């Protein structure tokens, strides 16, 4: 049986941390940021952690 291919879009978007949780980037960061509150802009710099419900599916797509 052939190997499962990883979903390349998921590989580019998600990273698995050492403790097993999955990191993702924040949405709404590409352009037209002048309308956003400065506090919102600074909090969006940080990466977010995926919910436990979605973790299994994302890890399957990556591996």
UniProtKB/Swiss-Prot annotation:
InterPro entries: Ribosomal_bL35, Ribosomal_bL35-like, Ribosomal_bL35_CS, Ribosomal_bL35_sf
GO CC, alphabetical: cytosolic large ribosomal subunit
Any one biological process term the GO annotation gives: translation
Keywords: Ribonucleoprotein, Ribosomal protein
A Pfam family per the record: Ribosomal_L35p
Signal peptide (residue range): none
Keyword Ribosomal protein: yes
Gene3D superfamilies associated with the record: 4.10.410.60
GO molecular function: structural constituent of ribosome
Keyword Cell membrane in record: no
UniProt cross-references to PANTHER family, sorted A to Z: 54S RIBOSOMAL PROTEIN BL35M, LARGE RIBOSOMAL SUBUNIT PROTEIN BL35M
Similarity-based family: Belongs to the bacterial ribosomal protein bL35 family.
Protein name as it appears in the record: Large ribosomal subunit protein bL35
Organism: Sulfurimonas denitrificans (strain ATCC 33889 / DSM 1251)
